Amino acid sequence: MSHSDQSQRFLFDDTDVRGEMVDLERSYSEVLAKHPYPEPVAQLLGEMLAAASLLCGTLKFDGLLVLQARSSGAVPLLMVECSSDRQVRGLARYSAESIGADAGMQELMPEGVLTLTVDPVKGQRYQGIVALEGVNLAECLSNYFASSEQLPTRFWLNANGRRARGLLLQQLPADRLKDPEAREASWQHLTTLADTLTAEELLALDNETVLHRLYHEETVRLFEPQPLVFHCSCSRERSANALVSLGQADCERLLEEEEGSITIDCQFCNQRYLFDASDVAQLFAGAGSQGPSETRH
């Protein structure tokens, strides 16, 4: 079965709950193609890609959403980004010798910390931090929303190295249902039904089939899907700006240490940018050695 990478929003007409579903295949494959990840790492990275895409779909902003997990375990870093125009990228760092074939999130990232950052082009940056607790990433994110002053939100995530899928339910401010007990009963009803969805079903079924399987007795409005794509924002210009920010003296020292050229590798896509002495001289031509430029990078 062929699936296009997409996020798709839906609403329940009789209650104040919205949902989002995400399906990643090609973009997930492109992320994995950049690095030879062990299967458990690839699965967790896929779940994070799906989670970031789901969260981005719930926000109205122009900018970047970043999910980053750090730990002292076999996977010290997981990082994914999803932009407001639905471009995704991600990476993981790991120690292969200490990863079991069936390792879960807690085995891979013990004592971990998850950071959620929303970085708008205009406006104030938001950052939330939570311990990486729970059986899996979906539980960790659900607990974060439950413990913070956010709209109640639940996640269901799964990935298998080929396809990454996610389902999100979020309770909206009171509109259709004003009574607190009725709102809570409706929320519990919808999330309990979603809890019956198996990982195999989430990975194998399309959005309409999943929603019919769970909510055939509810009135659900499904919106047009929005495409998601892999895209890395690295460029030679950004790499050059990074060198300028170091200052001319440090760049000249690096040229000496690296035998005449400076290499900058993108950790997300493995693209390599080389700068020789002539390139570096051109970067600082007319600028003296005043240090960082005002160019944002």
Swiss-Prot record:
The keyword Iron-sulfur does not apply. Disulfide bonds join 232-234, 266-269. Pfam families: HSP33 (PF01430). Keywords: Chaperone, Cytoplasm, Disulfide bond, Redox-active center, Zinc. GO terms for biological process: protein refolding. Under oxidizing conditions two disulfide bonds are formed involving the reactive cysteines. Under reducing conditions zinc is bound to the reactive cysteines and the protein is inactive. It is found in: Cytoplasm. Its main location: cytoplasm. GO terms for cellular component: cytoplasm. GO terms for molecular function: protein folding chaperone; unfolded protein binding. Belongs to the HSP33 family. Redox regulated molecular chaperone. Protects both thermally unfolding and oxidatively damaged proteins from irreversible aggregation. Plays an important role in the bacterial defense system toward oxidative stress. This is 33 kDa chaperonin. It comes from Pseudomonas aeruginosa (strain UCBPP-PA14).
